[in-house]
């Protein structure tokens, strides 16, 4: 089924709508699959938070709301579109639409506004559902976290790729959501070259921290990175 474009009317919804939606999502999650969430203790209780997760399936945002138990304003790339039967989700819950090639002033403004309201900003650093394994991150997540002086919360989601089809087959998918140790904020100040290098290094650290929450076969571009075992030990979560 071909993706359709995202309406321009999509924008972050009021807190009360997202709050009620989060409760609805919690109950729906009981039917979607057997969802195992690890690491809720790692969610900061206060302060600005940027949640960064891998993106293997359309159900990922839904599962992140289920796992975090708090409203999240997700950034979505308007060019990628969405499968028609999932359009209801961003229409009701809302999202921040962005251009895949740049982080414009309006995106920065909306993102900072989200954080000032005490909500979590949700970002998929890879830029969309691009691969069944991890790929290189775009610098947007780290950049927004740096200007907001926010803590970054790495999260992994797996097992939801066939969840939609399994629902109609009467099968509940086994889904795992792992929440890692928060890190940051970042300082990416300096010359253009220094800033670019800092963003690149911080983005790689972010993806390696997400990789540490996933089984080895999902590490993709980050397979064999020596920092992953260090983060795995730090998290102390099961990734099998």
Task: Label the predicted regions.
Residues 1-16, 106-240:
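Non-catalytic C-terminal accessory region of glycerolipid acyltransferases
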Residues 7, 30, 43-102, 110:
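Catalytic core of membrane glycerolipid acyltransferases/transacylases, capturing the structured
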Residues 24-25, 92-98, 124-129:
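Short, basic, glycine/proline-bearing loop/turn elements
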Residues 25, 64, 141-145:
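Short amphipathic alpha-helical segments and helix-helix/interface helices
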Residues 39, 54, 76-77, 124-125, ...:
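A secondary-structure boundary/capping signal
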């Amino acid at each position: 089924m071909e993706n359709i474009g995202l309406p321009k009317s999509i924008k972050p919804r009021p807190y009360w709508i997202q709050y009620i939606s989060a409760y609805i999502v919690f109950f729906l999650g009981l039917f979607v699959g057997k969802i195992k969430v690890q690491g809720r203790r790692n969610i900061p209780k206060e302060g600005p938070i940027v949640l960064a997760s891998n993106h293997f399936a359309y159900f990922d945002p839904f599962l992140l709301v289920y796992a975090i138990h708090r409203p999240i304003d997700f950034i979505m790339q308007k060019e990628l579109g969405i499968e028609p039967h999932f359009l209801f989700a961003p229409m009701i819950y809302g999202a921040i639409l962005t251009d895949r090639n740049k982080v414009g002033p309006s995106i920065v403004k909306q993102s900072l506004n989200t954080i000032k309201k005490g909500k979590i900003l949700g970002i998929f650093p890879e830029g969309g559902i691009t691969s069944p394994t991890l790929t290189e991150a775009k610098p947007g997540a780290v950049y927004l976290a740096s200007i907001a002086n926010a803590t970054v919360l790495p999260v992994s989601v797996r097992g939801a790729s066939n969840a939609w089809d399994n629902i109609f087959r009467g099968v509940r998918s086994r889904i795992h959501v792992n929440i890692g140790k928060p890190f940051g904020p970042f300082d990416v100040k300096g010359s253009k070259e220094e800033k670019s290098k800092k963003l690149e290094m911080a983005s790689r650290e972010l993806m390696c921290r997400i990789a540490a929450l996933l089984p080895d076969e999902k590490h993709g571009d980050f397979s064999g990175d020596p920092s992953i075992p260090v983060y795995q030990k730090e998290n102390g979560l099961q990734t099998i």
